[in-house]
Amino acid sequence: MAGLPDFLIIGAARAGTTALHSYLRQSPDIFMPAHKEPNFFAFEDDALDCRGPGAEFINNSVTRMSDYRALFAGAKTGILLGEASPLYLYSPKAPERIAHHVPGVRMVAILRNPVDQAFSHFLYATKYRIEPVADFTEALRREEERMAAGWQPLFGYSRFPRYAEQLDRYYARFPRGQILIRTYEDYLADPVGLMADILGHIGADRSFRADMSEKMNAGGRAKNAAFQDFLMKSNPVTRAIGMVVPKAARLRIRDRLAAMNMTRDDRMPKAAKAILLERLGPEIERLGPMIGRDLSGWLE
């Protein structure tokens, strides 16, 4: 349908989608809105009332078709249109809506070890000061009460990466060849090759080489929690800066300062890993044959 995407990055969260969005936008064959994660197909015509920390991420999603089309209004004629909303893989409603509006759309999903993905999501939430619990194991134990209270899907750490269940919904509506599935390990091992595969899949020039020098959306823990709070939460200084500095520039500065304040900490608590393997192990075992990959390493 004219004015709607030719391709979608549907997931997964914390699996390099921010970087892919940046790399694909550099291609002269492609137009992607600067607004990553509009989430339209997850929430079309929904009255959004998400609660809990960081609820604005969901509540500010694009829900009207006219607003969604407007995201692509600046594209040149004949160019490929696309967007990246990792929530589409998670959303039960997204596959049906995508099939209705853009049945021929090409899709890409990068899947990360769900145990690592869940912990990375937790670190992301602590980085942006929206996770009120410092211990990951305790956060996992609070999942059900948080979901029942209407908190945003991010806080369903072990619910978010149920890839086999999620792909079932897509394969019920689309030919498998329409969805390119790769893993986060593929991205880390050969980002140039992965980009070429994605470009070829969506119909762009696969020989295009993007600038991949900037590290994006890295996780970790804050070295100085008070400084991280200052950066991420509204206060008189940040509000004053917001009055004179454009939002895009302000967010770039904030994220760079936040990255400087982060330290790599990949030590997942053993109790948390045990909980995740119990919850997600059957999903991993089913996913491997589904996508034709040996994922036994994800169970270790």
Description of each model-found segment:
Residues 1-85, 100-110, 114-147, 174:
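PAPS-dependent sulfotransferase catalytic core
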Residues 35-36, 168-274, 293-300:
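The conserved 3'-phosphoadenosine-5'-phosphosulfate
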Residues 52-56, 85, 152-161, 182-185, ...:
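Active-site rim elements
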Residues 60-75, 129-211:
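PAPS-dependent sulfotransferase catalytic domain
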Residues 86-90:
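Short beta->alpha connector loops
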Residues 94-97:
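A short acidic, amphipathic alpha-helical/loop segment
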